[in-house]
Amino acid sequence: MAGRSGVNDEELLRAVRVIKILYQSNPYPNSKGTRQARRNRRRRWRARQRQIRAISERILSSCLGGPPEPVDLPLPPLDRLTLDTEEDSGTPGTESQQGTATTE
């Protein structure tokens, strides 16, 4: 596969198969039982999903040789950046005076 150096495609495919088996081993819980029982099953399922996600990240990082590098995002020039005041709760051009007390 293009873009990788030193990583065997067979190793990567084997890692992906292992991760797929991990996720398939934890199906979503059924919807039978009381509300509390369903809630507990979903809570335990989410905890197992977090563990599977952590294991999957460790498998991929060991296979690929480290954490992925962040992608550089293209940013606009600073002179084109503006503050949008339409989303503010006050009227444009005025600042909110919350939390400031004026004592004379």
From Swiss-Prot:
The RNA-binding motif binds to the RRE, a 240 bp stem-and-loop structure present in incompletely spliced viral pre-mRNAs. This region also contains the NLS which mediates nuclear localization via KPNB1 binding and, when the N-terminal sequence is present, nucleolar targeting. These overlapping functions prevent Rev bound to RRE from undesirable return to the nucleus. When Rev binds the RRE, the NLS becomes masked while the NES remains accessible. The leucine-rich NES mediates binding to human XPO1. This is Protein Rev. Belongs to the HIV-1 REV protein family. Homomultimer; when bound to the RRE. Multimeric assembly is essential for activity and may involve XPO1. Binds to human KPNB1, XPO1, TNPO1, RANBP5 and IPO7. Interacts with the viral Integrase. Interacts with human KHDRBS1. Interacts with human NAP1; this interaction decreases Rev multimerization and stimulates its activity. Interacts with human DEAD-box helicases DDX3 and DDX24; these interactions may serve for viral RNA export to the cytoplasm and packaging, respectively. Keywords: AIDS, Host cytoplasm, Host nucleus, Host-virus interaction, Methylation, mRNA transport, Phosphoprotein, RNA-binding, Transport. Escorts unspliced or incompletely spliced viral pre-mRNAs (late transcripts) out of the nucleus of infected cells. These pre-mRNAs carry a recognition sequence called Rev responsive element (RRE) located in the env gene, that is not present in fully spliced viral mRNAs (early transcripts). This function is essential since most viral proteins are translated from unspliced or partially spliced pre-mRNAs which cannot exit the nucleus by the pathway used by fully processed cellular mRNAs. Rev itself is translated from a fully spliced mRNA that readily exits the nucleus. It is found in: Host nucleus, Host nucleolus; Host cytoplasm. It comes from Human immunodeficiency virus type 1 group N (isolate YBF30). Residues 25-48, 63-104 are annotated as: Disordered. The keyword RNA-binding applies. Asymmetrically arginine dimethylated at one site by host PRMT6. Methylation impairs the RNA-binding activity and export of viral RNA from the nucleus to the cytoplasm. Phosphorylated by protein kinase CK2. Presence of, and maybe binding to the N-terminus of the regulatory beta subunit of CK2 is necessary for CK2-mediated Rev's phosphorylation. The lineage of its organism: Viruses, Riboviria, Pararnavirae, Artverviricota, Revtraviricetes. GO terms for biological process: mRNA transport; viral process. Residues 35-48 have a biased composition (Basic residues). Signal peptide: none annotated. A motif (Nuclear localization signal and RNA-binding (RRE)) lies at residues 34-50. It comes from the Viruses. InterPro entries: REV_protein. Its main location: host cell. Residues 67-77 have a biased composition (Pro residues). Residues 18-26 are annotated as: Homomultimerization. GO terms for cellular component: host cell cytoplasm; host cell nucleolus. The keyword DNA repair does not apply. Residues 25-34, 91-104 have a biased composition (Polar residues).
